[in-house]
């Protein structure tokens, strides 16, 4: 099963979602990309994912355009901006979903307050994607 997860920068939310989905089931072929990719992955995202036992430290932000002509079982946007500007995929997309999450990189405050926001969003992403995996994706794996 081939899944593409999109956000704006592909530096945080979509990377976390990709990491979690792959950790749920290694049979899944999961990619992530951004509509306006950042230059590097957010290090706080790497840190909170490592605490969850998922290593995303070697991931790099990618542009959604490189995936436009491919076929996908799922294309999932994880931020409102990506949902609004999500490109039309000329390739076949069987299921298009939007699962909006706040951007933890916009958190304000001291280090503890900011990292706690990253943990909160990480947990939301984990829980929502696990629910999607259990209720829908797992049943369709071929």
Spell out what each predicted region is:
Residues 70-91, 98:
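Mid-chain, well-packed structural core segment of small domains
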Residues 1-67:
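Conserved active-site segments centered on acidic
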Residues 37, 82, 103-105:
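Residue-level detector of flexible, active-site-proximal loop/helix-junction positions
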Residues 34, 79, 100-102:
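Residues at the C-termini of beta-strands that transition into short coil/loop
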Residues 15-17, 42, 85-88, 108:
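Short glycine-/acidic-enriched loop or helix-start segments at secondary-structure transitions
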Residues 10, 49, 75-76, 125:
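Conserved small-residue
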Residues 1-3, 67-78, 118:
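Cytosolic catalytic domains that perform sulfur/thiol-centered chemistry
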Residues 86-142:
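Phosphate-binding/catalytic loops
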């Amino acid at each position: 099963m081939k899944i593409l997860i999109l956000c704006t920068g592909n530096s945080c939310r979509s990377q976390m979602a990709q990491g979690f989905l792959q950790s749920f089931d290694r049979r899944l072929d999961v990619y992530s990309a951004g509509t306006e990719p950042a230059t590097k992955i957010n290090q706080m995202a790497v840190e909170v994912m490592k605490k969850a036992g998922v290593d995303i430290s070697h991931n790099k932000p990618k542009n959604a355009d490189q995936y436009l002509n491919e076929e996908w079982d799922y294309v999932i946007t994880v931020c409102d901006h990506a949902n609004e500007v999500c490109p039309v995929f000329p390739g076949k997309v069987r299921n298009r979903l939007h699962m909006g999450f706040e951007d933890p990189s916009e958190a304000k405050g001291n280090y503890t307050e900011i990292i706690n926001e990253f943990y909160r969003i990480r947990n939301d992403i984990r829980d929502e994607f696990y629910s999607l995996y259990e209720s829908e994706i797992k049943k369709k794996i071929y």
